[in-house]
């Protein structure tokens, strides 16, 4: 593998940082914020003969040095103007944090202004779905539930709280979708932080990219990406919440930040998730005559417990750093396993454990009068995963234990303990080469190693040497460059980008090979290029049209190359997946109404799929190609003053094409399995002020979700549901091969106390107690009740 471009890029970043370090900073800097600490973008700052606008994060800097005694004036639409006097004679650098207060008679105007940040993200040339986490933070909802209401998005879960989650974006799922936290690949947190466990209170918003992914995320995603943006509030804050629900569910969230003198700060984010997940499911059990009969049973070995804490400290607004932040995260996950991938038979003693420690450092600095921005992140994580399957005997669905002679409930007993070491480096540079032109560069280097032991696991043939005891390494690097330009008075925005992907992996292929030398490592590597373009044309101040295309790649993952030393065999011949993505969309929005229509086309070649080879083993192979297209529509309308109606619908046609294996040629043209092709959402929410007393509020809401039946196996096209888009007819397949139509309704309310520090919420999930399925027809919980209390302090006195 060639590292020349990687080394050159890092060397260039380092030299540029040192070259510009001594640049003069004799100017005024600051940040314009609201009362609750949220930034105010595009505020006007006037001082001396200069006029500047605040950025999206509320920050600003004077364009040249300021001398003497000067008056500074700040104004923004919907806010009371602010004026102050500064004495710069004895100051080289001044940092101001200025709070603007909303005008009392412009509540509606302030409300619209508060959405500007989210709106600006929605209007980028590369389309993304933006979820405002603050708008739903007080509700007893998980992040997965909120994301499930977005157009083109389906969240598949293998059960209840904390269980496996898979995001499907326009039909593409699994490893084709990648996850980030504040622009950093989420892999650095080793499974301790994700959409299946993070409290929505700790997020500012969520960005979901469909197909085309911007350079600043730096991933090798094919189907899209999810970026979790955490609270970036630098004020002194504290917030906590506690949620209790059915199935002995308890969710605790806590976060706070304190500021100190000389721009030092420190904070903590923590949460605890626990649930018995002992809801009832419909299964088949064996009667006294050894015949299968339907039964409804309560899950008895499905509990989940998760602890996560991240503490951080740093300094900001210094001549040598805009922000330097050190953090350390600790987590532990304990999970019981109730059944294998399918609900075929129960387990009663298998346990999974995952724990880790993750220190990291992040450095941000602007140079050369804000013409160059540097964002550097480095982390090292040490995690351990443990699987215990040692019981001698079996359990039935009622929890009754029958002793046996063989070890383990599953086909592969285990006492595995595997250590993972991971290093991630992310370097991002932005060059403002002209008022309407920017160049962005992003480089990610991800290296991890795996080594462990399993007294009950596989051995090298003819030896007693544990396969897990031999170290496996994996490294990938991704370099992206983009040129963003504005034309015709910003009516036309264009983003042209190029990416380079490379990986190298080293390990031992010991699968069913009597001649394997346990000291002979095999190395594999590959590299490829991707490129694309995104363009947006602003028709008027209410509407725009945008389009994007991308040719991209996804590199094989370590577990796909090396297997899991269990039932998944290694395959060192895997090649990167390659995909062509295209999007076209139109958006129209006013203060009270918004509508967006989007279409997409995807074609993926050499898709990496898990394929059976010889029982009980399977192996990842470059087998199939997938072609998909579809559309979605997203609507919202504010009715009168207190109500808002939202709705969206998605139809997609994702099919298998170019099947190369003659044995599987019959699946040519069939739908991608386990993937819904139509789903829709409708929501209604209200906001009533001064209901029981002055300054209180009650916010009721209702959400309805519909999913059309979809197939668990490949179905011939003539057996699929007929009618318009397959929405009105019935399929001609066995009911065990499909997931039926599903309807989900959730109803709840949120009450905000007059002080605005306390709020209380309640929600009934699955109000109609419908049968719901997900992830290969794994049954989801029925009707459940949830209550949540929130406490928030906007400012803590030092």
Where are these regions (language model features)?
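Short, acidic, small-residue-rich periplasmic hinge/interaction motif at the N-terminus
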Residues: 33-38, 44, 75-79, 89-137
């Amino acid at each position: 593998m060639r590292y020349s471009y990687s080394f050159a890029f890092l060397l260039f970043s380092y030299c540029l940082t040192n070259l510009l370090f001594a640049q003069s900073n004799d100017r005024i800097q600051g940040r314009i914020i609201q009362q609750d600490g949220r930034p105010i973008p595009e505020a006007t700052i006037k001082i001396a003969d200069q006029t500047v606008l605040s950025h999206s994060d509320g920050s600003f800097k004077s364009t040249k040095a300021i001398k003497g005694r000067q008056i500074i004036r700040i104004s923004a639409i919907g806010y009371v103007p602010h004026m102050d006097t500064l004495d710069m004679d004895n100051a080289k650098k001044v940092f101001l944090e200025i709070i603007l207060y909303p005008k009392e008679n412009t509540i509606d105007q302030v409300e619209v202004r508060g959405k500007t940040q989210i709106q600006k993200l929605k209007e980028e040339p590369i389309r993304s779905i933006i979820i405002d986490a603050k708008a739903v933070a007080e509700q007893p909802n998980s992040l997965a539930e909120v994301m499930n209401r977005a157009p083109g998005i389906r969240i598949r879960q293998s059960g209840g709280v904390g269980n496996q989650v898979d995001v499907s974006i326009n039909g593409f799922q699994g490893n084709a979708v990648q996850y980030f936290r504040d622009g950093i690949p989420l892999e650095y947190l080793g499974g301790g932080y994700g959409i299946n466990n993070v409290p929505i209170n700790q997020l500012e918003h969520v960005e979901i990219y469909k197909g085309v992914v911007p350079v600043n995320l730096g991933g090798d995603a094919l189907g899209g990406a999810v970026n979790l943006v955490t609270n970036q509030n630098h004020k002194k804050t504290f917030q906590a919440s506690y949620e209790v629900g059915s199935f002995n569910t308890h969710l605790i969230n806590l976060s706070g930040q304190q500021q100190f003198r000389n721009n030092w700060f420190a904070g903590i984010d923590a949460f605890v998730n626990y649930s018995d997940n002992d809801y009832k499911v419909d299964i088949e059990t064996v009667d006294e005559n050894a015949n299968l009969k339907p039964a409804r049973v309560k899950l008895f070995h499905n509990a989940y417990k998760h602890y996560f804490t991240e503490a951080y400290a740093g300094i900001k607004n210094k001549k040598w750093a805009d922000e330097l932040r050190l953090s350390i995260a600790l987590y532990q996950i304990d999970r019981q396993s109730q059944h294998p991938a399918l609900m075929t038979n129960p387990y009663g003693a298998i346990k999974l454990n995952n724990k880790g420690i993750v220190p990291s450092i992040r450095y941000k600095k602007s140079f050369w009068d804000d013409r160059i921005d540097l964002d550097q992140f480095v982390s090292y994580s040490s995690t351990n995963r443990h699987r215990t399957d040692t019981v001698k005997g079996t359990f039935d669905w009622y929890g009754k234990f029958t002793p046996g002679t063989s070890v383990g409930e599953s086909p592969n007993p285990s006492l595995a303990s595997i250590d993972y070491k991971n290093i991630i480096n992310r370097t991002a540079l932005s060059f403002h080469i002209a008022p309407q032109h920017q160049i962005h560069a992003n480089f990610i280097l991800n290296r991890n190693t795996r080594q462990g032991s399993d007294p009950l696991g596989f051995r090298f043939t003819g030896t007693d040497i544990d396969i897990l005891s031999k170290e496996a390494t994996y490294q990938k690097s991704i370099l992206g460059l983009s040129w963003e330009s504005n034309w015709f008075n910003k009516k036309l925005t264009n983003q042209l980008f190029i990416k380079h992907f490379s990986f190298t992996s080293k390990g031992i292929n010991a699968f069913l090979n009597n001649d394997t030398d346990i000291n002979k490592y095999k190395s594999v590597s590959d590299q490829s290029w991707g490129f694309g373009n995104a363009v947006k044309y602003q028709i008027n101040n209410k509407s725009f049209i945008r389009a994007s295309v991308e040719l991209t790649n996804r590199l094989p993952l370590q577990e796909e190359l090396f297997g899991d030393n269990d039932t998944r065999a290694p395959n060192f011949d895997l090649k990167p997946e390659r995909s062509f993505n295209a999007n076209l969309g139109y958006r129209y929005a006013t203060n009270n109404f918004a509508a967006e229509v989007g279409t997409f086309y995807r074609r993926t070649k050499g898709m990496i799929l898990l394929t059976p080879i010889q029982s009980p083993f399977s192996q990842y192979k470059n087998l199939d190609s997938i072609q998909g297209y579809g559309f979605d529509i997203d609507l919202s309308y504010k009715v009168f003053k207190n109500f808002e109606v939202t709705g969206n619908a998605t139809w997609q046609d994702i099919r298998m094409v170019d099947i190369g294996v003659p044995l599987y040629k019959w699946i040519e043209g069939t739908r991608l399995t386990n993937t819904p092709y139509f789903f829709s959402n409708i929501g209604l929410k209200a906001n009533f002020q001064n209901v029981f007393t002055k300054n209180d509020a009650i916010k009721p809401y209702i959400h309805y979700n519909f999913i059309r039946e979809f197939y668990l196996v490949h179905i011939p096209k003539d057996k699929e549901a007929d009618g318009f888009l397959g929405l009105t007819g019935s399929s001609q397949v066995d009911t065990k091969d499909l997931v039926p139509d599903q309807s989900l309704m959730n109803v709840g309310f949120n009450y905000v106390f007059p002080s605005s520090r306390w709020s209380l919420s309640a929600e009934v999930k699955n109000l109609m107690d419908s049968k719901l399925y997900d992830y290969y027809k794994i049954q989801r919980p029925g009707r459940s009740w949830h209550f949540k209390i929130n406490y928030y302090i906007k400012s803590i006195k030092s």
